[in-house]
Amino acid sequence: MPMSSLPAAILSHMTAINNVPPPPLHSIPNLKKSKHINYGQLNALCHIRGQHSRSMSNILSAHDTFMKQYPKVFLHQKPRLPKLFKQEEQRELNEGKEESQHQQPDDSNNIAVHVQRAHGGHILYRPKRATEKFEEFLAILKKLPIHRTPYEHKTVWKFLKTIPDLTFQLNDKHLKTLSKTVFSETWLKGSTVVANDGFYVILKGLARPQTNVYKNLIEGSDSPDSFISQSFHSFIWSEEFKNSTLAEMYLPSYDSMLSKWSTFGTLEVMPQNESETQMFSVVTEDDCEILKIPAKGYAKIKEEKIKLENMQKLKLIRMCPYYEEWPTLSIYELIALLKWKKFPPGHVIVESGNIISFVGYINSGCCNIYRSIIGFVKLRSNKVKRSQKLVYMGKLKEKESFGEISVLLQVPFTCTIITKKEVEMAIIEDKDLFVA
């Protein structure tokens, strides 16, 4: 049976296709990694556990993890700021130098500058930055101490360390504590500042002393809380004129004027009856900014220091073996007599055969104990010579005491005590013990 034309055409086409060779193989092009994708995070994201779990809780946990990790897949480039040209930068520096040179006056012929420097005062002409810092200092003092930041407390402390009348009498620790309590007061021209309740530092303006109990600080004072000024224009209350019949109110001359950084007042807390009779005051010649350190605040700091020292002494004596069962009241009687003292390494505290002059309680360090013995040394001539030597017997350690029997019974020491390294101890001198 003859085939139709259509099937024959299809058959011939299929035969022709089978005879045609397959097309050549081509390699798959490499994929370029994107610079904006973190492929390590992407790989971790694709292998999160629980994505294909049948448990609903696992699926939700995997979904939360996926959503948290997803933003890490994309890299965020940091924005780059345009570079500055060196020429412009150099030009700005040169302009700044020229301006500072023009602004700073020539003080070579200014006698006031040399006088100020000779008395240890502040230089009259300061860079612009110092002026800005001083204005910042004034603004901080206007705040209540409780509202100041740690940075502001540190700024006040740094300025207090530049005032000679304060650093002469107060250590750095006291100044740091006081810096958190000081404040500034504004006084109008013609005001009378009564300074019986604190120590004052003039920050702006002029003031004139007006009192019958002033004494120039450059002459000194025996009072433990008074200040010996390094500046001529500083005055302080003096006990020497307390009962003086020659004392009278007066206004000093212009040479005694108190200016910037001048100090006056006292850190002693005066009794009420004395503060009423002994007026300690200045009169402002301008509108003044005056820093005040309250005497009561300083007294509180001293009380806290004494309490801490007494607690340290009590703890030291309590830890010494012979005082563990002593009543507290008896120990407090000893605390009133204790003084701190340091000894360098190799210092002979007491020699054998001598009576020691104090009772010691070792707070830090240690001492070696030696016994003096007589030995015999054979010489080349077959003769024997007597020789005295120190033999090590032991040591005194921290939280141990010595010298009680020698001081109380006036018995000589049978050994020699030498410090091995620096030793700090609390001591009671024999003269204080016998008086007590």
Swiss-Prot record:
Pfam families: cNMP_binding (PF00027)
Entries under InterPro entries matching the protein: cNMP-bd_dom, cNMP-bd_dom_sf, RmlC-like_jellyroll
Ligand binding (a nucleoside 3',5'-cyclic phosphate): 322-436
Ranges of Basic and acidic residues composition bias in the record: 89-105
CDD domains documented for this protein: CAP_ED (cd00038)
PROSITE patterns found in the cross-reference section: CNMP_BINDING_3
Region annotation Disordered: where it falls in the sequence: 89-108
Disulfide bonds: none
Domain of life of the organism encoding this protein: Eukaryota
UniProt xrefs under PANTHER family: CYCLIC NUCLEOTIDE-BINDING DOMAIN CONTAINING PROTEIN (PTHR23011), CYCLIC NUCLEOTIDE-BINDING DOMAIN-CONTAINING PROTEIN 1 (PTHR23011:SF32)
Name of this protein: Cyclic nucleotide-binding domain-containing protein 1
Native species: Homo sapiens
Gene: CNBD1
